[in-house]
Amino acid sequence: MKKLVLFIMILCLVLLVGCGLQDEAPTTQAITTTTEEVTAMNTDLGYEQISGAQAKNIMDTESDYVIIDARTTEEFNEGHIEGAILIPEYEITERAEAEIPQKDQLILVYCRSGRRSKIAAEALVDLGYTNVKEFGGIIDWEYDIVRS
């Protein structure tokens, strides 16, 4: 009887120790996204999301582009990027074709924080524009602005 009790106790001890051990602690899998993957995701939307620095580089090196400020008139008058034309996000569908007749024109779009510029960029793509780049908001713009 003592041998049976001792055997059961050893068996329970082995089971408890075996269940309590893990080879390694749980880990969190890191999510990495390459620039190419981000670009592919953005081009699925029909437009490309770029940084302010990339937009500034285009402005410095290219000559044939249009900058759209998708904010309100009041915001535009407080300060805007030089050369930008004001087409508030809610007026894009009515005014874009008159302001920008070429559908393959390079268009750079921004707003205050990036929300309205994304909406405007999507609307431009829906209108058939094929070379739209959205670069977020003027609050992140590290370069000169024109104050009216």
Describe each PLM feature range.
Residues 4-8, 15-53, 58, 65, ...:
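Rhodanese-like catalytic fold shared by cysteine-dependent sulfurtransferases
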Residues 70-75:
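Short, polar loop motifs at secondary-structure junctions
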